[in-house]
Amino acid sequence: MNGSMPRHHAARVEAAIASGQAARSALVASWRRSSRLHHLDPGGRTSPMRLTEAELHQARERIAPLLAAAQGAMDRLYQAVGASGCCVLLADGEGVPVDRRGTAADDATFQSWGLWTGALWSEEHEGTNGIGTCLVEQRPLTIDRDQHFFTRNTLLSCTAVPIYDHEAALAGVLDVSSCRADRTDAFSSLIALATGEAAKRIEADLFRRAFSHARIVLTQGADGQCGGLIAVDADDLVIGATRSARAALGIAPGRALQPVPAADLLGGDTARDHLAGGQRAVVQ
């Protein structure tokens, strides 16, 4: 990185913020939060802060169900992207990676960039970045190279997808990061697709574990595609629904789900069809 690069990037960030583009650009809005709300300097050179081993252990314990549910999906995602110089990170709701997958030969590089367990990747600490900005905006996104707030992070490309728990609350983020200069737009699109599918598998497994005593039934969205999962007890009461199921059924994501007859929620014939085939509809 040449000497003019830090000054150029910092000037570009400040110019975009000053121009008022934050109202039209989610990226500039994130830059503005980083600068004005969190008082960060895009030219800052301090490496990411890290938790102590004891603090990291506590963070892992707090999201133990998510960690357990994520293992298989993280393994499969890493098998798909690891050979291309990417690492896979699972971060908690505070933006702290609590688990990762990576090639041993790349460990030193990723550690030096802070793409490691225990690092603090919230927007408050690291400005615009995949994990932190995903947590704020609660949507899948990619922060590519100079879209990062800090100049020192502009060699990174990070794709992040939010993960919601069995109560439809934001639980963490699944992230695939790379510091390779040859990452193409086409490859980034494939990574985004693979990461999104892995996040869905984690959510489904987390939901099944939380409602292991219930039937887990697929719902249909308005487009005929899978709308999410609901948990139905022995009395045919819906006692749980994933975030996507709530959206498909018109249930506010922030509202506590009270037990409701499946027939009332799904509709008469639809409910009977779903419940009659409940065991067939269970996600394996």
Q: Which stretches of residues belong to each language-model region?
A:
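Intrinsically disordered, low-complexity terminal regulatory regions
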Residues: M1-H125, N129-F150, L155-S157, Y164-H166, ...
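PAS/PAS-like sensory domain cap-loop motif
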Residues: T103-D106, F110, A245-L257
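Proline- and acidic/polar-enriched loop/turn elements at helix boundaries
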Residues: D146, L257-Q258
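PAS-family sensory/regulatory modules and their coupling/dimerization elements
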Residues: D146-Q147, L155-A160, D264-Q284
